[in-house]
Swiss-Prot record:
Residues 256-260 are annotated as: ACP-binding. GO terms for molecular function: 3-oxoacyl-[acyl-carrier-protein] synthase activity; beta-ketoacyl-acyl-carrier-protein synthase III activity. The keyword ATP-binding does not apply. One of its GO terms (biological process) is fatty acid biosynthetic process. This is Beta-ketoacyl-[acyl-carrier-protein] synthase III. It comes from Helicobacter pylori (strain P12).
Length: 330
């Protein structure tokens, strides 16, 4: 291989509106203590009515492109992961975001892998770069999850937040600046554990079908058990495959779904506190955006430096899951 795929830059963006746990007490039977005890979440950000996922994503994308010392014209491919797209079926959020960046006549498409979306993005970008098909790939996790939440459902609406993270994936000849490994998987037999019902209206030919509200639905207890079991196995597999141990990893950056899930994985693998990046307490679960947001925050705080090895892992609707070992190419 002449070159490897490399994570050249990272940036994140969140909306300005903070929503604290206590604010849910206005319309739900809940409390700040109840939410934080079960999830570790203290607050989250919600976009305003005019903002869409692409609006959040484009801010992070512009900064990521700038940090990579590139211009939008240098981008060969745009891929977006989201469960809250700007439009129901088309156009893709990637196409909308490309237009806002001024990128024309370049391929753009979305990935639907829910909270595992960013790991899937890394897999796609790595393949395109290392095959020689693209030199610079922009990947974006962008979510306005507040647009798909049922605010009468205490089991879901308290968990999620809005935000975006973006990366530029380019080339390097150095292994220790590369996306070392990515593994992704799915099992559709559990698709009813996490889903958003279809919103297409019945036609005169199938009037018996009922149009459902497009709200996120989740079997919380079942998802929790499967997530912990699956993530532990997946992380152990990728470390063993690459002859690495937890102490070889500079930062462990898991999907920020629930503090208890993160803690279970951290304790089992014996990661030290300084290795673990946590943002769930202030942003909640931002689905496909959570890992790049956490990476972006670690970078801005000076915790993530060039050459650092990151272990990423995620689990989401599909069910989907995946993990990655990534050196920060800087």
């Amino acid at each position: 291989m002449e070159f490897y795929a490399s994570l050249k830059s990272i940036a994140m963006h969140v909306p300005s509106e903070r929503v604290k746990n206590a604010e849910f007490q206005q319309f739900l039977d809940t409390s700040d203590e109840w939410i934080e005890k079960r999830t570790g979440i203290k607050e989250r950000r919600f976009a305003n009515d005019e903002e869409k996922s692409s609006d959040l994503g484009v801010i992070a994308a512009k900064q990521a492109i700038e940090r990579a010392h590139l211009t939008p014209k240098d981008i060969d491919l745009v891929v977006v992961a989201t469960l809250s797209p700007d439009f129901l079926a088309m156009p893709s959020t990637a196409c909308v975001l490309s237009a806002k960046l001024g990128i024309e006549n370049k391929p753009a498409f979305d990935i639907s892998a829910a909270c595992t979306g960013f790991i899937y993005l890394l897999s796609v970008a790595k393949a395109y770069v290392e095959s020689g098909m693209c030199e610079n790939v922009l990947i974006v996790g962008a979510e306005k999850t507040s647009s798909v939440l049922d605010f009468k459902d205490r089991g879901t609406c308290i968990l999620f937040g809005d935000g975006a993270g973006a990366c530029v994936i380019g080339r390097t000849k150095r292994l220790k600046e590369s996306i070392l490994d990515v593994q992704i998987s799915a099992n559709g037999n559990f698709s009813n554990y996490l889903y958003t019902p279809r919103t297409l209206k019945p036609t005169p030919f199938n009037a018996k079908e009922e149009a459902l509200e497009p709200f996120l639905c989740m079997k919380g207890n079942e998802v929790f058990k499967l997530a912990v079991k699956t993530l532990l196995r997946d992380v152990e597999m990728i470390l063993e495959k690459n002859a690495l141990k937890p102490e070889d990893v500079r930062l462990f950056i898991p999907h920020q779904a629930n503090f208890r899930i993160i803690q279970a994985v951290r304790e089992h693998l014996d990661f030290k506190d300084e290795q673990v990046v946590l943002t769930v307490h202030k942003y909640g679960n931002t689905s496909a955006a959570s890992i790049p947001m956490a990476m972006g925050e670690a970078y801005e705080e000076g915790r993530l430096k060039k050459g650092d090895l990151m272990l990423l892992d995620a689990f989401g609707g599909g069910l989907t899951w995946g993990s990655a070992l990534v050196y920060f190419g800087g």
